[in-house]
Amino acid sequence: MAKIINVIGREIMDSRGNPTVEAEVHLEGGFVGMAAAPSGASTGSREALELRDGDKSRYLGKGVLTAVANVNDLIRTALLGKDATAQAELDQIMIDLDGTENKDKLGANAILAVSLAAAKAAAAFKGIPLYAHIAELNGTPGQYSMPVPMMNILNGGEHADNNVDIQEFMVQPVGAKTFREALRMGAEIFHTLKKVLHDKGLSTSVGDEGGFAPNLASNADALAIIKEAVELAGYKLGTDVTLALDCAASEFYKDGKYDLAGEGKVFDSNGFSDFLKSLADQYPIVSIEDGLDESDWDGWAYQTQIMGDKIQLVGDDLFVTNTKILTRGIENGIANSILIKFNQIGSLTETLAAIRMAKEAGYTAVISHRSGETEDSTIADLAVGTAAGQIKTGSLCRSDRVAKYNQLLRIEEQLGEKAPYRGLKEIKGQA
C-alpha cells in the first residue's frame, strides 16, 4: 500500500507574479509527489472556485494562505493513512470534505494541487512515469499518443494590451511526423514572426502565454501576418501548418451583442458566427474555441450547424471541464470538442471523467494550460496518458510554457513508436 504519511501545502508564485498553491504528498518508503495549481485570466463563470485571501495588504488580495492552511490542516488530516494509488477515493474524500458544488470551502486550487501531487507520488511508488500511471487511472493502460500542439504565437483580448479582439491566434504543425519535428516547426515560425513584426515596426513584446501582442488594425490582419510568417519560415499554410483561434467571446459579449471594440464592429449572435466562418473561408482555420459566450446556447447551436462538420468547435468557458454541462452540450449537439483545464473542475478524477465522456460522444478533448502557470508540467503527461491528441500550452518562449514542451520531448524519447504523432487526424472534422 502506498500509505500517505504527510501532506504539505505552501504558497508559491505563478508566471504572472501572483501566488498559487503548491502541495507535496509524502508516502511510506520516501516517495514524494509535488504539484502546483495554475490560474486563469479569462475564466468561465461556472468554474470551480480558486480560493484567494482577499487581504488587500498582501499581494493585492490575491494571497492563498487560506487555501494553503486547508491543505496543511483539513485535507492533510483526511488523507493521512490513505492509499495514494486509490486516486478516485482520495479525490472523493476531498470533494466530500469541501461539500460545495464549486469547491468554494477548501478551494479548487487546494484540492487540485493535492490531487495531482498524490498522482505523482503514486507513480513514484509504482516505479512508472506519471503518464503511464494516468493511463492506468484512465482505464487505458499502455495507450498513448503525442499531442498536436496549438501554439499561441499572437495574442489579443485579455492576454494582451492591443486592439485585437480575438484572444489567441495559434499554429498547429499538423504536417510533422513526430512531436519533436512539430515543435521545431513551431519554433521556426515563432522566430520568423518576430522578424516580420520587427521589420514592420510592430511590437515584439509578448503576452502572458508567450505570444506576440502587436497593435494590429483587425483580426484579419493578425491572420495575414501569421500567414506571411509561416510561408517565410518555409512551410505551406493548410498543409504543413493549420490555424486555430481562441475567441474568448465571453470577454466581449455585452447586452446580447458581440462588441469587437478593436474593429469597431458589433454583431448579434448569428452574425458573429458568420464573421468567424468568413475568416475560416479565407484561411485554413481548423479549430475555433469559445466562438460565442458561455450562456449563448442558441448561438452555439447555430455555429455548430454551420461549421461543426468541418471545423473543431471547442467549448472552454462553455463546458468548464464539467461533465454535467458537457452532458447537456452532447445532448443538444452543441460544439464538438472540449477544452480540458484541471483547475476548472479541481481534481484529476473529475478531469479524466470529462475526457472519457467527450471521447465516448465523439468529441475531441484538448488539454490546456492557464495564463497563470508554473514550472509544473503535469498537463504534458495528461495529454500523453489519455491519448487526448491535442495540447494547448502557449508559445515558444517563457519557461512556464516551454517546461511542458520539454516534458513532451522527454516522453516521446521514452516511448518512441508507442506514442504516434497523428497530425491532422487528431482534429475534429479533419480526419
Curated annotation (Swiss-Prot):
<feature type="binding site">
    <location>
        <position position="316"/>
    </location>
    <ligand>
        <name>Mg(2+)</name>
    </ligand>
</feature>
<keyword id="KW-0456">Lyase</keyword>
<comment type="function">
    <text>Catalyzes the reversible conversion of 2-phosphoglycerate (2-PG) into phosphoenolpyruvate (PEP). It is essential for the degradation of carbohydrates via glycolysis.</text>
</comment>
<dbReference type="InterPro" id="IPR029017">
    <property type="entry name" value="Enolase-like_N"/>
</dbReference>
<feature type="active site" description="Proton donor">
    <location>
        <position position="209"/>
    </location>
</feature>
<dbReference type="InterPro" id="IPR000941">
    <property type="entry name" value="Enolase"/>
</dbReference>
<protein>
    <recommendedName>
        <fullName>Enolase</fullName>
        <ecNumber>4.2.1.11</ecNumber>
    </recommendedName>
</protein>
<keyword id="KW-0964">Secreted</keyword>
<keyword id="KW-0963">Cytoplasm</keyword>
<keyword id="KW-0460">Magnesium</keyword>
<feature type="active site" description="Proton acceptor">
    <location>
        <position position="341"/>
    </location>
</feature>
<feature type="binding site">
    <location>
        <position position="370"/>
    </location>
    <ligand>
        <name>(2R)-2-phosphoglycerate</name>
    </ligand>
</feature>
<keyword id="KW-0479">Metal-binding</keyword>
<dbReference type="InterPro" id="IPR020809">
    <property type="entry name" value="Enolase_CS"/>
</dbReference>
<dbReference type="GO" id="GO:0000015">
    <property type="term" value="C:phosphopyruvate hydratase complex"/>
</dbReference>
<feature type="binding site">
    <location>
        <position position="289"/>
    </location>
    <ligand>
        <name>Mg(2+)</name>
    </ligand>
</feature>
<keyword id="KW-0324">Glycolysis</keyword>
<dbReference type="GO" id="GO:0000287">
    <property type="term" value="F:magnesium ion binding"/>
</dbReference>
<dbReference type="GO" id="GO:0009986">
    <property type="term" value="C:cell surface"/>
</dbReference>
<dbReference type="InterPro" id="IPR020811">
    <property type="entry name" value="Enolase_N"/>
</dbReference>
<dbReference type="GO" id="GO:0005576">
    <property type="term" value="C:extracellular region"/>
</dbReference>
<feature type="binding site">
    <location>
        <position position="341"/>
    </location>
    <ligand>
        <name>(2R)-2-phosphoglycerate</name>
    </ligand>
</feature>
<feature type="binding site">
    <location>
        <position position="392"/>
    </location>
    <ligand>
        <name>(2R)-2-phosphoglycerate</name>
    </ligand>
</feature>
<dbReference type="GO" id="GO:0004634">
    <property type="term" value="F:phosphopyruvate hydratase activity"/>
</dbReference>
<dbReference type="InterPro" id="IPR036849">
    <property type="entry name" value="Enolase-like_C_sf"/>
</dbReference>
<comment type="pathway">
    <text>Carbohydrate degradation; glycolysis; pyruvate from D-glyceraldehyde 3-phosphate: step 4/5.</text>
</comment>
<feature type="binding site">
    <location>
        <position position="371"/>
    </location>
    <ligand>
        <name>(2R)-2-phosphoglycerate</name>
    </ligand>
</feature>
<dbReference type="GO" id="GO:0006096">
    <property type="term" value="P:glycolytic process"/>
</dbReference>
<comment type="similarity">
    <text>Belongs to the enolase family.</text>
</comment>
<feature type="binding site">
    <location>
        <position position="246"/>
    </location>
    <ligand>
        <name>Mg(2+)</name>
    </ligand>
</feature>
<dbReference type="Pfam" id="PF03952">
    <property type="entry name" value="Enolase_N"/>
</dbReference>
<feature type="binding site">
    <location>
        <position position="167"/>
    </location>
    <ligand>
        <name>(2R)-2-phosphoglycerate</name>
    </ligand>
</feature>
<dbReference type="InterPro" id="IPR020810">
    <property type="entry name" value="Enolase_C"/>
</dbReference>
<comment type="subunit">
    <text>Component of the RNA degradosome, a multiprotein complex involved in RNA processing and mRNA degradation.</text>
</comment>
<dbReference type="Pfam" id="PF00113">
    <property type="entry name" value="Enolase_C"/>
</dbReference>
